[in-house]
Amino acid sequence: MMVKQEEPLNEISPNTPMTSKSYLLNDTLSKVHHSGQTRPLTSVLSGDASSNSIGILAMHNNIIRDFTKIASNNIDLAIEDITTVDHSLNSIYSLLKSHHMWGHINSTVKQHLMIIVKLINNNALGLASSEIIFLFNETNLFQAHSLKNILLADFSTWNDYYLSNLKILALQIILKRKLVDEYLPHILELFSHDKRYLLKDPNLKAHALTKIVLSFFSVTTSCKVLFGLKFLQYIKQFKLPFKKFISNITVECFSKNLLHKNYLEMGPNKIYLNSFYLSYSMLYDGLDKIMLLDILSYEETTEVQRAIKSKKEFNEYCNMSENRLLWSCISVDDLNVILENATNFLQNKGKHISATLKCLVCLWSTIRLEGLPKNKDILRQFDCTVIYINSNIKSINDESAAALLSELLGVLSEICIDYKEPKRLSNIISVLFNASVLFKSHSFLLKTANLEISNVLISNDSKTSHRTILKFEKFISSAQSAQKKIEIFSCLFNVYCMLRNDTLSFVFDFCQNAFIHCFTRLKITKFIEFSNSSEIMLSVLYGNSSIENIPSENWSQLSRMIFCSLRGIFDLDPLELNNTFDKLHLLNKYELLIRIVYLLNLDMSKHLTTNLSKITKLYINKWLQKSDEKAERISSFEMDFVKMLLCYLNFNNFDKLSIELSLCIKSKEKYYSSIVPYADNYLLEAYLSLYMIDDALMMKNQLQKTMNLSTAKIEQALLHASSLINVHLWDSDLTAFQIYFGKTLPAMKPELFDINNDHNLPMSLYIKVILLNIKIFNESAKLNIKAGNVISAVIDCRKAQNLALSLLKKKNKLSQGSRLALLKSLSFSFFQLIKIHIRIGSARDCEFYSKELSRIISDLEEPIIVYRCLHFLHRYYMITEQTCLQNITLGKANKAFDYLDAEADITSLTMFLYDNKEFVKLEQSLVLYFGDQLEKTFLPNLWKLHLGKDIDDSICLSEYMPKNVINRVHNMWQKVMSQLEEDPFFKGMFESTLGIPSSLPVIPSTMPNNILKTPSKHSTGLKLCDSPRSSSMTPRGKNIRQKFDRIAAISKLKQMKELLESLKLDTLDNHELSKISSLSSLTLTILSNITSIHNAESSLITNFSLTDLPRHMPLLFDKVLNNIDNKNYREFRVSSLIAPNNISTITESIRVSAAQKDLMESNLNINVITIDFCPITGNLLLSKLEPRRKRRTHLRLPLIRSNSRDLDEVHLSFPEATKKLLSIINESNQTTSVEVTNKIKTREERKSWWTTRYDLDKRMQQLLNNIENSWFNGVQGFFSPEVVDNSLFEKFKDKFYEILHQNLPSRKLYGNPAMFIKVEDWVIELFLKLNPQEIDFLSKMEDLIYFVLDILLFHGEENAYDEIDFSMLHVQLEEQIKKYRATMTTNSIFHTFLVVSSSCHLFPWECLSFLKDLSITRVPSYVCLNKLLSRFHYQLPLQVTIEDNISMILNPNGDLSRTESKFKGMFQKIIDAKPSSQLVMNEKPEEETLLKMLQNSNLFVYIGHGGGEQYVRSKEIKKCTKIAPSFLLGCSSAAMKYYGKLEPTGTIYTYLLGGCPMVLGNLWDVTDKDIDKFSEELFEKMGFRCNTDDLNGNSLSVSYAVSKSRGVCHLRYLNGAAPVIYGLPIKFVS
């Protein structure tokens, strides 16, 4: 292998003579030995560290070029400028190192070599030596202090391209300086192990090296044989012509001359003979080969064999002073004997450790010096030696033995390197580390670290870097001080350990692993600029740390961007982002990636999406598409970015971009293999978010087939489990979900469910485990609510929320991805909880969670989450009809929407347009967004459903089928109504009283032809406001053509009925149940009134049950949920996902029907009347169960029906009445407030106050009178307790039909009354319950007459009302009614239960004149009533003994002194007279005391503010199973808090849920004086004040006592109407 002529080494000759201008090596010793410390690190070049590298390199090249030019002409002048050159080189090395620009170092090294050659050629040998060391030290981790270190330096990736040349130059300098004797041992070791130190370079300058060997042959006297053999080896090995080196003799002669006796005297250098000879011998095998025995004397050889055969102790073979065996050139056979002796020697436990170590040093030093090739015996002995050391290391207890151990391990490590045994070298490193720990020796630890790094550098395998970092974690942990830890860390954290792998992926992997495992162990609090580390390394290292005041301003822009992106500090000048970057910088090729990573993190730090679309498109188009061109693997920096980008796109619902990015990633699977699972996960979520059904189905099938989670890594398992959650949610298969996530997966991968981190997962993974479990519980809740399992849904959702809230406290410590996932899960859990409680109609819990959500919104920070929360709250406030909050949240939501990217986020855009009622734009936006993909998504259809439209069942997803059915029924209803409106007869149908059942079926054959025809009016040109009413409105005239298609309407109504009956009730919200019950009622009412329904009774049972269900369910769930132990919400085991005994709406519907049946079969002498309001028509709905009569009836009262007959009549709709009532109550509450009463000081002020109160009382009276007259009028008898005499009734009924036959035009022409429609008996009975003595009798009777006429009209019997003689009807009917009442027997219903709906609760129905004298109590529902009755065996009235155990609370707040004075004496007498009674007076009761009073008493009386809710939590009352009958006589104790479509909440219901059979309270605030009078009268009438046991004589039941006591109030309506009773009628007995 010949040297190329243009190489600078050709200019150097080993025979170049020394001149007088040569510089002494001693003159530069300080420079040689301290070059690393004395050379300034600051650059002499213009510009700083962040300057453009091209300019700096250009200036450096100019300096080098100038030096070379000057040196060629005047070396002395050039040498004077060498300092400038060195500083320039130093700056360039620092620049390359700092900027990690190792791709440019080769050219700089070449320049440096050229300078060295110039110096050597010009005999500046001292400077040349210095430059050699300078060059080496600037490009290697382990520093050289002299040429000796250079010669024996190992090859690594950092020097393998120049080290052999540098060694040749060093050897030349040694020759020229005639320093061979000084360096001879190192030179001999160099050539003895030339395979390691020289020949590893494939580009070795063999010619120059061979000439140098020949030169050493020439100048040495005792090593001629050695260098001669080496010369012959290289001639043969490199195929060099012998004549080129020695021309006057042949190679054979040269070989023979080596055996000259003068050459054979090698002295101590003979120890290298075997090594040199073995290298020579491997190449020569002919007859001309020199034999080792020819070199050695015969006597010497036989002496060795004789000594070995004598079987002496192994220690006798050792030359302790020389640290080697007594002989050299040991044969393989002789070595085997020695090794066997050594083995026996080690097994002798009696030897002192120091002696043994000394012998082992001798053995292994000799083996290395001999250059013996490795074999099994040597390696076996090596392992035995290591085992011996490990076994006996603890017995080393002095410094000399420790030093011997260090020496031995040093030799063993060199042998491992010689033999290329990295695993055994690792064992030596482990022994060294153990010794450092045992001896607490930093020097041992430092040797351990350096040896480990040497191993890394020599092996040049970047794949081992992680293993090395893990070792350094242990090294650093064992270091005794902070400074020592830093020193050890510096051994690892430097550019050299990067092995010239300048890909971004390796840089990040190395630095982040170093940070995680090692840097954190340093526990430093200040910035340290670790030597030999690049700014990129520092930016990654400190970017992951929390250390403040990092001087990143000295770094390049790209490094600063990396640092800022990792650290989350975005303080870069925006102008810097647009500057031109250093083109030679390592990071320049990653500029786009780094820039968009920074921009993404910048946006995320500001919680914006301003650049999100741009970033994504840039990444896809400019970077991702070129991934095939990249030879390197993806970096963790990019991986984290892509994961974060996918996460942020998903988080902000940029679903379209998320799909595009995910699909691109999947198309580049080779490069993005580690990202593909993430892409799959987000792709599925995007498809699901956009309702792209077919695509989601394809992804679902793909995900179900991949990955074995039992063998997967934890992070992969977490991701895949998350995807599987989406799959199961899509399938809506609760059972499969529960089995997989409750049993299968926990058994397969328990660490995924380790909430307590018993597996000691790293914090980042542990957080992800918690987030996964939050998602599992959230989605379990969602699946449960889909399946109608409300209880399980609440429990799981509460668990998710508790976990999420616990994490929220530490949100600032979470990664961005975890933080976003947490916010999403937390908001989802709130939404779910509120939705669940909306589902069950629980207003109290909805309000609690909505307020909590409102409270934390500001802490959520992310606009998308804030907007979604505000949007959700806006919809919630619409449901609860909190108009003010609704408007406020809409305004805030619109402001939050301004921060969103509406173009990319179709979900938020459609929400925004929907909330702002821009429905046309909503549909247009969907078309624009999806374009030609519109057919692939269900989203437009979903919004059609939200907009109240119905869609084809074939395209409707199963979970939205109920909504589709409700919309369809509602739309069909609108069409029916439209048809009715077009017809002059039927358009006023809902201005007429309608009843079910209303008529008896008539046999068609007996009816005249005109009866079944659609009725026609004798009028023309009717307007929409016209109505078939009095003569003034129905003139005679020509019949008009009818537009009402009865058959079509009936068909639609029956279809509506079937659709409503097909609904799966479990899937409906409670307010939707109310809506369908209203629709069902309307459908049934119209069908019943325009056709004869043969199964009206069955239909009413169904309708009553459906109406009662939304009243019953909230109370049931309130009780059940309240009794759940809180520990269930903190039990995070997924095995709890499978929860039995869930309450189902379907089963409860059956229960409601059963309760209705039980009530009807009880045969109790009661009426159960339901009062409700229909929001669709504005009608008042009355339903009645009559157990004694086995009859169900239903009335639909139009509240403006009198107005339709008399245009002058005052109109009072239900909303208007409610508004007036609330106004009166609110004004009354204000007048009784402390703020108002405390200001009354003068007589005039008191008079003014009373005037206001009287006026309010009068307004209340007028309102009740209006309600009574305009709403109920003739149908007041519906509430009457009178029982009609059956025999008298039949006579009246015959007369009734006779009167109709005489007066109705439709019947006058026909002789047989049996041919005509007959109305139901209960309708006729209403006439008999009218009292002719009443002033408004005629008005009431007229109301009933129109009721009957409308029944006939809607069933097809046409009568023009202006042709009827109403006066005659009035006279004839009045006569018959008087006859009946004159002969009837008095018989009445014992008690009336009012089932008052939430919308009707506030009205004091009991104070209407036709109800005020009745025994009335309220109940929330049929089920509640039936439960109370069954509990007390259906015995009424309920008799309660009060001869003992009475509990009373009087004036607990201490501010009702007058009330206290009034009742103190009475209560004290009761305490004295009735054993076990208890009184708490003028002090606040403890919760436990109050609960005991409620549970353990026969009667509980509370006289104070409110209902005592301030002293006991409602949930504690609800937990009770039995509560005493209770009198809550404070203000608003029976008031309900209204929340629109949700069921109201109040103290009264709390007591009923706690098992109270009867509770009395006030509907609104009352004045203490009046309510005290009422209470006193009440106590008197029901026998509570009696001092004797005679309670059974004159005492009244509580319900009668209440009705009789109202009149004592000064303000009979404002105060007297407030008390109401809930529960059973009770009578107190002794």
Swiss-Prot record:
Subcellular location(s) per record: Nucleus; Cytoplasm, Cytoskeleton, Microtubule organizing center, Spindle pole body; Cytoplasm
Major subcellular site: nucleus
One record GO biological process: proteolysis
A Pfam family hit: Peptidase_C50
Catalytic activity: All bonds known to be hydrolyzed by this endopeptidase have arginine in P1 and an acidic residue in P4. P6 is often occupied by an acidic residue or by a hydroxy-amino-acid residue, the phosphorylation of which enhances cleavage
Start and end residues of each Peptidase C50 domain: 1443-1542
Positions of transmembrane segments: none
Listed EC numbers: 3.4.22.49
Active site per database record: C1531
UniProt keyword annotations, A-Z: Calcium, Chromosome partition, Cytoplasm, Cytoskeleton, Hydrolase, Nucleus, Protease, Thiol protease
InterPro entries on file: Peptidase_C50 (IPR005314), SEPARIN_core_dom (IPR030397)
Tree of life domain: Eukaryota
Molecular function terms, GO-annotated: cysteine-type endopeptidase activity
Known regulation of activity: It is inactivated via its interaction with PDS1, which probably covers its active site. PDS1 degradation at anaphase, liberates it and triggers MCD1 cleavage.
Record-level GO cellular component terms: cytoplasm; mitochondrion; mitotic spindle; mitotic spindle pole body; nucleus; separase-securin complex; spindle
PROSITE patterns for the chain: SEPARIN
Region listing for Disordered, in residue ranges: 1016-1037
Function: Caspase-like protease, which plays a central role in the chromosome segregation by cleaving the MCD1/SCC1 subunit of the cohesin complex at the onset of anaphase. During most of the cell cycle, it is inactivated by securin/PDS1 protein. It also promotes anaphase spindle elongation. A component of the FEAR (CDC14 early anaphase release) network which promotes CDC14 release from the nucleolus during early anaphase. Cleaves SLK19.
Complexes and interactors: May bind calcium. Interacts with PDS1. Interacts with MCD1.
Listed name of the protein: Separin
Gene source species: Saccharomyces cerevisiae (strain ATCC 204508 / S288c)
